Amino acid sequence: MVKLFCAIVGVAGSAFPVDIDGGQSVGDLKKAIKAESEDITIPAKDLKLFLAKTEGGAWLPDDDQAALDLEDGKVHEDIQALIDGEKMKATWTIEDVLTANNMTKRKGRAPKSRQIHVLVVVPEGAFGSASETSKMDQLVEKVDKMYEQTVLGKRKYVHSEVTSTQGRQLLNDLDIRVEFVRTVPFDAGEGSSVDPYEWKRVIIENGEEVVLTEEQQRKRYRRYVEHNIGTVLKETQLCVIGVERGTNILTVKVPGREIELAGRTDLLILSDLVAMRPTEVQYLPGVKMLIEVKRDVKASNDFQALSELIALDLLVDDPVMALLTDLEGEWIFFWVAEKINSSARIHKAAINKPGEAFEVIRALLVQPPTAPADTDTTEIKLPYFQSPVKRLKLRKALPPIGEGGDNGGIRESIERYYDIASMLGPDIEMARAVARQVTRSIPTFSYFS
């Protein structure tokens, strides 16, 4: 018997377990899923099932942002990529599917708790009234966001939820360009040989190993970072702190723009006054850098790190850096470097050895905090980076605030929708029509409308 945790895509609610024998078919699984979800009104055979298998070949953890979005009825880009792929064939047995995808006990990937295993896609209109209400609420919420963004010009980016599309939009809104810069050979310093971080695994009841999540290991990897820069921390009166979930310390409104950045990061390196008086962290005293830790670094994670860097840079007076890392072979540094013409430039450099990365961090921490009085730019030297490394405060690089585009027709439609909704309540068909009009106004999507 296999216990599979299933989640219905686009419908708010927790994942639910379905017990099924490995020898039963995917068609049988569809029937079991329908039996567990009373609101599904279509025949079980019309359900579409997809394995919740991540890029790294593992099951989707239930605390992954994509899984959290599922619970809220949102469709994360990682989930969209999965349901755009190959669906589970109704004629295959569950064992066939797991074996073909290397998700078996023999491969160390048998389904277990705290994971999502099956994504369920239900054709539109296949739910009962309760779900229709939920879908209407979601649509109205989307129109609310369109109203804020199109009419009021407001945008809000939550760091941990920034998708590739949103990340590019943020950079475009602020006229920021990201440039990858080369690293160069450097004579290794003392103590440059550092072992990569070992992600902790635990043995569960059935004897299988499970890798703990980033959240569960924050204290442990904080100590790993602290151990490898401890001497410099002491000399510079700095410390490494882990930012607890729910502490949205990197929340800021971009000056002169209706853009808000919100959320937190994993680690901060800042004044050791915070170690003595933890509540002072809200003021970010002497902060030097943030560290965003991912067990598996993906290209899309760049945008989360960039969003966090922009927020931290705007919150403090001195230049800062961001590091995106798996604490093994991916150490990606970001910093605001310069302004060319009207665009701010954020530079990005990658290092693949922990020892070299810690040399960069140690060198960064001993740098003087501010730029000379007669210039906006600081130039510093860092090991492995091409010299000089330019640093600039983002406020100095942001372009002047320009006039908004001609969104008159869209604004009128959304304002008209709100006028009607304020008197008669939400109208789902009108909300859909407004959504379609906004979509058609976006060049990328106008081709398909």
UniProtKB/Swiss-Prot annotation:
Motif Nuclear localization signal (NLS) per record, residues? 217-223
Upregulation: Expression is the highest at the mycelium stage.
Q: What superkingdom does the record give? A: Eukaryota
Signal peptide annotation: 1-17
The record's GO CC annotations read: extracellular region; host cell
Glycans attached where? 102, 341
The segments labelled LQLFLAK domain in the record are 18-54
UniProt note: phenotype after gene disruption: Leads to a reduction of virulence on soybean.
Ranges for region Effector domain: 124-449
Assigned protein family:
Belongs to the Crinkler effector family.
Q: What is known of its domains?
A: The CRN proteins have modular architectures that include a signal peptide, a conserved N-terminus, and highly diverse C-terminal domains. The conserved CRN N-terminus harbors a distinct LXLFLAK motif, which is followed by the conserved DWL domain. A highly conserved HVLVXXP motif marks the end of the CRN N-terminal domains and forms a junction where diverse C-terminal domains are fused. The conserved CRN N-terminus mediates the translocation into the plant host cells. The C-terminal effector region is sufficient for its activity within the host cell.
The name under which this protein is listed is: Crinkler effector protein 115
| Organism (species) | Phytophthora sojae (strain P6497) (Soybean stem and root rot agent)
Gene name, please? CRN115
